[in-house]
Design a protein with these regions (language model features):
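Conserved RNP beta-strands of RNA recognition motif
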Residues: 29-34
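Acidic, glycine-centered active-site loop in nucleotide-sugar glycosyltransferases
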Residues: 9, 28, 124
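PLP-dependent aminotransferase class I/II
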Residues: 35-178
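Conserved active-site segment immediately N-terminal to the catalytic lysine
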Residues: 1-24, 53-58, 109
Length: 178
């Protein structure tokens, strides 16, 4: 965002290194970032079973450490990550150009990135009013697609007590296609 990496824009930034992510490990992994020393100390304690030092537990915690193999994979990938982002942005530009050339803008809403931002393009997601029909047609033509997060978070069982009116979300979950 405006030349800054997104994990440094708030008090705590988090990222996933799930294998399908642009900077993905070979297994589950993630990280949290902060510039606040006290928060950093608390975050380290939480991922070390709540330990302040060996066998001295000062808070509830869990085993949230990244294993050495995942760290090694990520360190290796991090060395070429800027080049990876350039390539991903190039592919996204090609998708956009081809869709503009071949598909009516009335049928498809393309993703946009503000001039002062860069995207890592974890997915290239469009909005299509007749998504399921388009998805079927693409599958028949051998083009793989995905619908990410088809059920809004506020409709998940864990949030059953929450009542929200999210009209834009309702529309999006019926239209998004990657």
């Amino acid at each position: 965002y405006k030349g800054n990496r997104s994990c440094g824009l708030s008090t705590i930034g988090c990222t996933s290194f799930f294998p399908s992510k642009p900077l993905g490990a070979y297994g589950d992994a993630g990280a949290s970032f902060t510039a606040d020393p006290e928060l950093a100390k608390a975050m380290r304690q939480i991922i070390e079973h709540g330990q302040e030092s060996r066998y001295k537990h000062v808070r509830l915690g869990l085993n949230g450490r990244m294993d050495s193999l995942q760290a090694a994979v990520l360190l290796s990938k991090l060395q070429v990550f800027d080049d990876e982002l350039i390539k991903r942005n190039s592919v996204a530009e090609q998708y956009t150009e081809l869709l503009i050339e071949h598909v009516s803008r009335e049928l498809v809403e393309l993703p946009t990135v503000q001039h002062y931002n860069k995207s890592s393009w974890a997915q290239y997601t469009i909005r299509v009013s007749r998504r399921d029909q388009v998805r079927t047609n693409l599958a028949q033509a051998g083009v793989p697609t995905a619908v990410h997060y088809p059920i809004p978070l506020y409709q998940q069982e864990s949030l059953a007590e929450v009542t929200l009116d999210c009209e834009n979300t309702e529309t999006a979950v019926q239209q998004v296609l990657s």
